[in-house]
Amino acid sequence: MLVGILTSNQKRHKALASYVNYMGHDVFLIQEIPKTQNYEEGIIKYFIDVNEAEGSIFSGDKWTIDIENSHSIDKGLINQVPKEVDLLLECDVIVIFGSSLIKGQLFQKLSTKKVINLHMGISPEYLGAACN
């Protein structure tokens, strides 16, 4: 089965793609890369701590497999439906985990597919709140 994954580029997001591949499925991965921002020191420390925690959980072979069919796009551009999305739509199932909010034409296209939306928060308003 070809599993499409639309996600971000944090360790927990990469781990999902690695694990699906480890379980024997082909993976087509689109990762959104966030823009570098100037955060306050407290926020920087928080994300360093999250990164370290994820590193301790998602280490080992099944969590760190390189995905051959991997594409990166700038965060927030997914709704402009880049060419990679056409390939994503050919997948047997699509998993959305940690991506930008999906709307417009992309939402319409995805609504005709088998899609699993993994969202840790209680509301899209908390997007990026690292609800884990």
Pin down the residues of each PLM region.
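One-carbon transfer enzymes
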Residues: 1-132
